[in-house]
């Protein structure tokens, strides 16, 4: 039996995705405009979600981000894409086209993150909760890192998007395992930690640990989409990797 159906409130849809994206990156939350954060000669890593997150429609707003980089003195040759797979499998070429769109797939170098390769990740330190921080070497060595993705609720991290592009997206397997164990109680057999659940951020140790992991990399910028129940854009948030994401979770 259906006990209850909960519908979201009515929200205006974005009709011009490119313009909405450009407005977001030029009027960001918590930091300077993207054009002021990058400089000629920078090697820029764009972090995108994998094939399991195509609902965020990266291919529809990422071209505007790349255009803004190009207009700010960053040519395609200095931009590369890392697919934030976490522990998921690699994406094949057809899936990469679905993520990026045909044009960007043809223009930019694209790499899958490898959570399991010891040479593929760099140790950056340890979080206050004891999580060893291993992050994708290509991202660590980039001059600038820009996170993309989409914001939605998450079963034990409160919300997806934001810092999840780094943890688990760009993290080594030991980092991911230690972080995800925080969703359980400290007692053997104690089950699920009751402070880790949908929409909870403050006091959610999984989310807080993810933020600590992300801070080790300290991306320079973030662009995240927010979608309605029909899969249409209702907002693009951009800016500081935490502040802009947090603002998006409060929509």
Regions found by a protein language model. Name each.
Residues 4-6, 15, 55-56, 147-148, ...:
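Short helix/loop capping segments that flank catalytic or ligand/cofactor-binding pockets
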Residues 1-24:
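N-terminal amphipathic/basic leader segments beginning at the initiator methionine
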Residues 76-87, 224:
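Short internal beta-strands
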Residues 29-47, 73-76, 217:
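Glycine-rich phosphate/diphosphate-binding loops that line cofactor/substrate pockets in enzymes
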Residues 158-177:
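A short, gly/pro- and small-residue-rich
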Residues 191-251:
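Membrane-embedded hairpin module used as a gating/binding unit in multi-pass transport
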Residues 90-160:
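An acidic, phosphate/nucleotide-engaging active-site surface
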Residues 54-74:
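Histidine-anchored nucleotide/phosphate-binding helix
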């Amino acid at each position: 039996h259906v006990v209850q159906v909960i519908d979201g409130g009515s929200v205006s849809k974005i009709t011009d995705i490119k313009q909405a994206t450009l407005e977001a990156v030029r009027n960001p939350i918590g930091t300077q405009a993207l054009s002021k954060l990058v400089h000629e000669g920078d090697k820029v890593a764009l972090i995108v979600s994998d094939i399991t997150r195509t609902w965020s429609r990266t291919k529809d707003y990422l071209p505007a981000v790349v255009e803004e980089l190009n207009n700010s003195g960053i040519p395609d040759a200095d931009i590369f894409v890392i697919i934030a797979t976490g522990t998921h499998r690699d994406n094949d070429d057809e899936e990469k086209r679905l993520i990026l769109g045909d044009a960007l797939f043809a223009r930019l170098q694209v790499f899958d993150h490898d959570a399991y390769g010891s040479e593929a990740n760099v140790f950056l330190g340890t979080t206050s909760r004891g999580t060893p921080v291993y992050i994708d070497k290509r991202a660590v060595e980039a001059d600038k890192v820009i996170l993309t993705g989409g914001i939605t609720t998450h079963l034990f991290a409160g919300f997806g998007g934001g810092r999840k592009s780094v943890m688990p997206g760009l993290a080594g397997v030991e980092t991911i395992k230690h972080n995800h164990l925080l969703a359980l109680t400290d007692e053997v057999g104690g089950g699920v930690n009751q402070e880790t659940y949908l929409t909870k951020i403050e006091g959610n140790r999984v989310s807080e640990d993810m933020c600590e992991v992300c801070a080790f990399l300290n991306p320079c910028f973030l662009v995240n989409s927010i979608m309605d129940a029909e899969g249409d854009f209702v907002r693009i948030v951009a800016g500081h990797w935490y502040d802009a994401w947090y603002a998006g979770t409060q929509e």
